[in-house]
């Protein structure tokens, strides 16, 4: 094989390089355009596009609810916070049984989420789509999302059935 001398390069390599550069010059602006406009291609968005908005009903004085909302946002959810005067009344109106009560109740698609439920559990619920009212983490266990602690305690996420009975959905 001949070394890349001036004539060999001009005759065999340069024409291919020119075609390659021209093709890239035409393709790159089109590929970059969605990013410049602030949108992300559907293949990149993936499952985040399918996540429903989380509507959270909470007391105006509760700070941990905001931390839980931030946890959800970091995991791809859009969250709307609604301050209510009576959280238990909002919970009852939405349809979550009182015995699973916590500091906030949320609606996520067709489901209710009570308390500091991890985002991964909500995503699993939305993927599996069981016949249920939703998920609950009763009370406010230290170490749950929004209740971060140096001394976390084990807790369960409960799947609340339409009959009001619950079973363990996940252990943390």
Outline where the language-model segments fall.
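Loop/turn elements at helix/coil->beta-strand transitions in domains of secreted/extracellular proteins
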Residues: 51, 77-78, 131-133
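Stable alpha-helical elements in mature extracytoplasmic
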Residues: 61, 68, 83-86, 118-122
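Bacterial N-terminal signal peptides
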Residues: 15-29
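Conserved helix-turn-beta segment immediately C-terminal to the redox Cys motif
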Residues: 69-89
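Thiol/selenol-based redox catalytic cores and closely related redox-interacting motifs
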Residues: 93-172
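Boundary at the C-terminal end of the N-terminal hydrophobic targeting segment
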Residues: 30-34, 42
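Bacterial N-terminal signal peptides that target proteins for export
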Residues: 3-18
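Local sequence-structure signature of Cys/Sec-based thiol-disulfide redox active-site neighborhoods
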Residues: 47-69, 75
């Amino acid at each position: 094989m001949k070394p890349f001398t001036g004539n060999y390069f001009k005759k065999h390599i340069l024409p291919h390089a020119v075609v390659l550069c021209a093709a890239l010059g035409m393709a790159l602006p089109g590929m970059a355009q969605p990013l410049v406009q602030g949108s992300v291609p559907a293949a990149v968005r993936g499952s985040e596009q399918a996540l429903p908005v989380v509507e959270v009903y909470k007391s105006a004085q509760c700070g941990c609810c905001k931390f839980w909302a931030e946890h959800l946002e970091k995991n791809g959810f859009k969250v709307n916070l609604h301050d209510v005067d009576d959280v238990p009344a909002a919970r009852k109106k939405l349809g979550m049984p009182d015995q699973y009560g916590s500091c906030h109740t949320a609606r996520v698609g067709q489901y209710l989420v009570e308390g500091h439920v991890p985002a991964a559990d909500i995503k699993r619920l939305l993927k599996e789509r069981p016949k249920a009212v939703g998920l609950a983490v009763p009370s406010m266990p230290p170490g749950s999302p929004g209740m971060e602690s140096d001394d976390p305690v084990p807790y369960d996420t409960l799947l609340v059935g339409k009959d009001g009975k619950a079973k363990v959905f996940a252990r943390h």
